[in-house]
Amino acid sequence: MSALGSRETHVLTTIIESYITSAAPVGSRTVSRRSGLALSPASMRNTMSDLTDMGFLEQPHTSAGRIPTPKAFRLYVDALLRQSARRDEAPLHMVEALHGHEPEVGALLRRASNLVSEHARQVSMVLAPGPAEARLRSLDFVPAGEGLVLAVLVLEGGMVRTRLVRDDTHFGSDELVRFGNYINAHYRGHTLSGIRNSIHHELSGGGAQLEAMCAQALALGSLALDSIDDDRELYVNGTRNILDQAEFAELGRMRELMDALEERSRLLELLDRTILEDDVHVTFYPDDVSGGAQRRAPDGLRGCSMVSAPYGGASPLGVIGVIGPVRMDYRKVLPLVGAVSRVLTQLLRERFATG
């Protein structure tokens, strides 16, 4: 907290951490007892008054105590982030909890989301990788009725996508098997985005003259791959933890937050905004959200914050996030999110095209 002197920093940190624990305004006696500073009552009150004047504290009308403002939490969190940036290794128990778990990507991410919600006692979210950067394990074509073919894509990590594509040529079963074998022989282990580009290049005449069978296989493969959208799964856990938070004790406020957590498209947008962050990042709502109506956070998230971190290395695959009241325990949550992010990066980098 370099913007403040050592005394003000110590007092403000004590108030913030007392408020995190109690959810109640913090008085000067509490600060004196917990801070360990040898200040007279008058000096302590003066310091708290100065912090109030600087916008770091506010005083509810019904109490002589103070509560930290979002400005105070931002200063506090930034100091913690600088400390946690020095920790490169994930705690062993986190590694063990996720290593050796289900090999399928969805199961791994569900486990990660559940692990974070259990430890943070907040709502956790994990945005899954899209299929574009997943590596192809196999592509098979199956007749699906008059003029239709079912394309079955199996991707590394256990993701499966099926799509119906038109077949105006009415290929037989044997031909469809040969088409699948050709694509698998040439493109297994490549990313879907890379395969799309290669096939488009070949079909547009950029490659050597293609034999008829090869051209037909690539044309059908192109139809199948172009129909695969980049829709992404979002794994949410721990919504019941909201019930334990004093901020959401009022029924109407709780419903607002629950409604916000059900707005999947908005949550995806909020997580996607943080995917290019270098490491753990904290967003306060609504203070850190700018832009037009299309970029606003759901109203139900007011007074909340999100701790998030991308996973996947230089080319991020997804984001892990924790949503809770601004008063969440950042000393616990920041290293937790960072640790799980690093473990997911280790486990998934072999299955996707990551740096």
From Swiss-Prot:
GO terms for molecular function: DNA binding. The keyword Glycosyltransferase does not apply. GO terms for biological process: negative regulation of DNA-templated transcription. Keywords: Repressor, Stress response, Transcription, Transcription regulation. It holds the Pfam family HrcA. SUPFAM superfamilies: GAF domain-like, Winged helix' DNA-binding domain. The keyword Cytoplasm does not apply. InterPro entries: GAF-like_dom_sf (IPR029016), HrcA (IPR002571), HrcA_C (IPR021153), WH-like_DNA-bd_sf (IPR036388), WH_DNA-bd_sf (IPR036390). Negative regulator of class I heat shock genes (grpE-dnaK-dnaJ and groELS operons). Prevents heat-shock induction of these operons. PANTHER family: HEAT-INDUCIBLE TRANSCRIPTION REPRESSOR HRCA. Belongs to the HrcA family. HAMAP family: HrcA. This is Heat-inducible transcription repressor HrcA.
